[in-house]
Amino acid sequence: MNPLTLSLVLTTMMAGTLIVMTSSHWFMIWVGFEMNMLAIIPLLTKEHNPRSTEAATKYFLTQATASMLLMMAAITNLLYTGHWSIMKLINPTASIMMTMALTMKLGLSPFHFWVPEVTQGIPLMSGLILLTWQKLAPLSGLYMIMPLINTDILLIMSLMSIAIGGWGGLNQTQLRKIMAYSSIAHMGWMMAVLAYNPTMTLLNLYIYIPMTITTFMLLMINSTTTTTSLSQTWNKLPLITTLILITMLSLGGLPPLTGFLPKWAIIQEMTKNSSIIMPTLMTLLALLNLYFYTRITYTTSLTMFPTANNMKIKWQFKNPKQMMSLPLMIMISTLVPPLAPMMPILT
């Protein structure tokens, strides 16, 4: 892609997200979402092949439908209250429609079907942006209207998302789809605690994004997109493959890695608020995520047939500039739990 075009696309995408995060007017929020959606489509079709085109089309249709639903909710609320303000979401119909629109943009169940299909059809870098940066705008919208929406609907959707995120990844061999289902499950955890403690949702987001970035960066170094190719790179790049597997276990929530910290904090917060059944179900469903990540680790490293590697091992990375931040990201993705006593929100 032309560097000038790339810089314009990235700037527009960031501007759209910032407009959503800083606006209190429904029309400006809609404009921010539209800027965000139109800016990322060139990144999705960066590789000119039918699969990328299909993924971009699915993404566009889903996001356009969600934007239409968002505008319908805003207009319905305008007719009822006479205000465009985000804090005047009083009409119950408008509130439900707005929740549906934002969760569709976020990829929560039952509006999750586009996430694995789109992620599978695009390059790894575009998938990284889709599963990290593109979550910020709808999450900020839900964060702002949280006191005004039906929490029961959100809790049901979050529980469904955790279940779908676990079940969907069980029979997958494509790493991009596995990351997509993991993203759906993580969004479910964030939405579950949003009704109890929105700050805990931000903590979960701050941990989820570095873990996802680390995993995608390591996959890009390895040029790996399937579990089969991941197991074949063990002899060529054992260190990188080991780091991928450890980061994946962290994404699954295995203690004492970083991914366990937000799950433990969310369960603790919900238990403090006299909610017992919900965190119990969430914990049981989270075992599905941990199971398929553990299975990938087991089949990749412990059941590999011993083979002699006659090639010269090349330890240098493909792009040194891109990998300068990788050691820090790996530390954040694996070694944060010992710092938990220093976090006031957890004490």
Curated annotation (Swiss-Prot):
<feature type="transmembrane region" description="Helical">
    <location>
        <begin position="326"/>
        <end position="346"/>
    </location>
</feature>
<keyword id="KW-0520">NAD</keyword>
<keyword id="KW-0472">Membrane</keyword>
<feature type="transmembrane region" description="Helical">
    <location>
        <begin position="67"/>
        <end position="87"/>
    </location>
</feature>
<dbReference type="GO" id="GO:0006120">
    <property type="term" value="P:mitochondrial electron transport, NADH to ubiquinone"/>
</dbReference>
<dbReference type="Pfam" id="PF00361">
    <property type="entry name" value="Proton_antipo_M"/>
</dbReference>
<comment type="function">
    <text>Core subunit of the mitochondrial membrane respiratory chain NADH dehydrogenase (Complex I) which catalyzes electron transfer from NADH through the respiratory chain, using ubiquinone as an electron acceptor. Essential for the catalytic activity and assembly of complex I.</text>
</comment>
<protein>
    <recommendedName>
        <fullName>NADH-ubiquinone oxidoreductase chain 2</fullName>
        <ecNumber>7.1.1.2</ecNumber>
    </recommendedName>
</protein>
<feature type="transmembrane region" description="Helical">
    <location>
        <begin position="144"/>
        <end position="164"/>
    </location>
</feature>
<dbReference type="GO" id="GO:0032981">
    <property type="term" value="P:mitochondrial respiratory chain complex I assembly"/>
</dbReference>
<comment type="similarity">
    <text>Belongs to the complex I subunit 2 family.</text>
</comment>
<feature type="transmembrane region" description="Helical">
    <location>
        <begin position="111"/>
        <end position="131"/>
    </location>
</feature>
<keyword id="KW-1133">Transmembrane helix</keyword>
<keyword id="KW-0999">Mitochondrion inner membrane</keyword>
<dbReference type="Pfam" id="PF06444">
    <property type="entry name" value="NADH_dehy_S2_C"/>
</dbReference>
<comment type="subunit">
    <text>Core subunit of respiratory chain NADH dehydrogenase (Complex I) which is composed of 45 different subunits. Interacts with TMEM242.</text>
</comment>
<keyword id="KW-0679">Respiratory chain</keyword>
<keyword id="KW-0249">Electron transport</keyword>
<keyword id="KW-0813">Transport</keyword>
<feature type="transmembrane region" description="Helical">
    <location>
        <begin position="201"/>
        <end position="221"/>
    </location>
</feature>
<feature type="transmembrane region" description="Helical">
    <location>
        <begin position="178"/>
        <end position="198"/>
    </location>
</feature>
<dbReference type="GO" id="GO:0005743">
    <property type="term" value="C:mitochondrial inner membrane"/>
</dbReference>
<dbReference type="InterPro" id="IPR050175">
    <property type="entry name" value="Complex_I_Subunit_2"/>
</dbReference>
<feature type="transmembrane region" description="Helical">
    <location>
        <begin position="274"/>
        <end position="294"/>
    </location>
</feature>
<dbReference type="InterPro" id="IPR003917">
    <property type="entry name" value="NADH_UbQ_OxRdtase_chain2"/>
</dbReference>
<feature type="transmembrane region" description="Helical">
    <location>
        <begin position="1"/>
        <end position="21"/>
    </location>
</feature>
<keyword id="KW-0812">Transmembrane</keyword>
<dbReference type="InterPro" id="IPR001750">
    <property type="entry name" value="ND/Mrp_TM"/>
</dbReference>
<keyword id="KW-0496">Mitochondrion</keyword>
<feature type="transmembrane region" description="Helical">
    <location>
        <begin position="25"/>
        <end position="45"/>
    </location>
</feature>
<feature type="transmembrane region" description="Helical">
    <location>
        <begin position="237"/>
        <end position="257"/>
    </location>
</feature>
<keyword id="KW-1278">Translocase</keyword>
<keyword id="KW-0830">Ubiquinone</keyword>
<dbReference type="InterPro" id="IPR010933">
    <property type="entry name" value="NADH_DH_su2_C"/>
</dbReference>
<dbReference type="GO" id="GO:0008137">
    <property type="term" value="F:NADH dehydrogenase (ubiquinone) activity"/>
</dbReference>
